[in-house]
Amino acid sequence: MRVENNNVSGQNHDPEQIDLIDLLVQLWRGKMTIIISVIVAIALAIGYLAVAKEKWTSTAIITQPDVGQIAGYNNAMNVIYGQAAPKVSDLQETLIGRFSSAFSALAETLDNQEEPEKLTIEPSVKNQQLPLTVSYVGQTAEGAQMKLAQYIQQVDDKVNQELEKDLKDNIALGRKNLQDSLRTQEVVAQEQKDLRIRQIQEALQYANQAQVTKPQVQQTEDVTQDTLFLLGSEALESMIKHEATRPLVFSPNYYQTRQNLLDIEKLKFDDLDIHAYRYVMKPTLPIRRDSPKKAITLILAVLLGGMVGAGIVLGRNALRNYNAK
């Protein structure tokens, strides 16, 4: 009787197939190597944590200034420009816009230093211009908070100085324009007075030629330039003397211009306490540092140490098996 030899798939072993149990046994036997590798990795991680620079982020939220914060500035603009002065809402938008631009410029400058500092400004809510979130990354929590407050104040002072300079320039220009306007109106008033005197003198000549000494009309309202001589030479001579000593006649606009000039000259820069922003949230004192993260660093050290240790064990055993062949 012939017995057939059937191949059982479970009894054949592929030499290239990984034996999981054998792998685990190898790792168990080399556990001391793995443990030492993990300990070394943890030691290196602790050393890194000891020397690595800590990063703490302080954050503040700002928005446009209140009306009260720019009351002096708004009043100055009203004095300078009168009816053409910008609205309070426009001033608020302009000020926070200048603050944002100056803050961004400072952040760029700090980032380009030999030892860069991270200062950022961005909208707090996506697709909305205000409020703005500003932040600073420092090596200590207190340092980050202090630096952020310092840089915010620094930018505010810079904007304040720029606004005062702009105001001085605008006041100087406004004063010059008003003075020029007054001089122009005074020249016009003087010319009108001189013209009136010449007209009366001309009428006096006609009256003398016509030998009209007494008024020939009953109502002076009906007298025109052509019939002015009918008032008579005596009246015309008296009118010339009166017009010569009479002060210049100005329109109401002249006195309003003088009042505007006086108001501008009374403006004082020391009284203008301008702020280009308002705090929604003052710089925070961070309670958690951004990096390095102790827990994550140690966990990664354990995993990396274990992987390196396992690699050493398996590599060493593979080398032994290869040499044995």
Swiss-Prot record:
Confers a modal distribution of chain length on the O-antigen component of lipopolysaccharide (LPS). Gives rise to a reduced number of short chain molecules and increases in numbers of longer molecules. PANTHER family: CHAIN LENGTH DETERMINANT PROTEIN, TYROSINE-PROTEIN KINASE. GO terms for biological process: lipopolysaccharide biosynthetic process. Pfam families: Wzz. Belongs to the WzzB/Cld/Rol family. Residues 1-31, 316-325 are cytoplasmic. GO terms for molecular function: protein tyrosine kinase activity. It is found in: Cell inner membrane. Residues 53-294 are periplasmic. It comes from the Bacteria. Pathway: Bacterial outer membrane biogenesis; lipopolysaccharide biosynthesis. The keyword Transport does not apply. SUPFAM superfamilies: Bacterial polysaccharide co-polymerase-like. The chain crosses the membrane at residues 32-52, 295-315. This is Chain length determinant protein.
